[in-house]
């Protein structure tokens, strides 16, 4: 099932995508009892990022590459001002000289989770979505001497998410991840290459903070590459979908 948040006219709501149409649902999307009778064509709606401004995005750092002896991965937050929808813009900050894309699988939480064991973790998953954890590359070197920099990950529009939540993924531990820039393959990998798997990530984050329905955990990026003003960036994840954004000049 593909669950999307969308705007129809002046109304913002959630719905289920069926073919070329979207069927509005009432209430919250995390516990769908039935699909409503109100149907819109996808061409008539604007897709929004599939979360609200009250939802958290605790993102995972350094989860690909050589395995090491860490107990768990690093965690950082993407603040609500970074959220951007499918077909929305990534604003290239005027103060930055190097910006990179990071294509990631986002795990969407279905119910309140705190101190969750790895063995129970998948019971708290609603589905999966595409995330682009955009980062200001040069701040990694220029700011990190002062502590983990807010500038690295937190410029406005630096977290496109979407286009929808896919609830039916048989094996999220083996998903192909690709990122295209202007139609050319720029980076790729597979979730099988993660150092820490999804159950570990959910458990690890739930020891730090209480996860709520709709929170999204980006699981890390296998490869990155630079993006520039005028680029069209596409995150494509097997079984989930395609998240497309335009890179525009700061305003």
Question: What are these model-derived regions, one by one?
Answer:
Residues 5, 24, 57-60, 105-109, ...:
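Short hydrophobic-aromatic micro-motifs
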Residues 37-40, 67-69, 135-251:
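Catalytic-pocket segment enriched in acidic/His residues
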Residues 48-49, 90-99, 113-120, 149-152, ...:
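A generic local secondary-structure boundary/capping motif
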Residues 49, 56, 97-99, 203, ...:
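Residue "hotspots" at secondary-structure boundaries inside conserved domains
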Residues 52, 100-102, 212, 228-229:
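Residue-level recognition of short, solvent-exposed, well-ordered loop/turn junctions
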Residues 63, 102, 106-109, 115-132:
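RNA pseudouridine synthases
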Residues 73-86, 101, 234-238:
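Structural signature of FAD isoalloxazine-binding scaffolds in flavoprotein oxidoreductases
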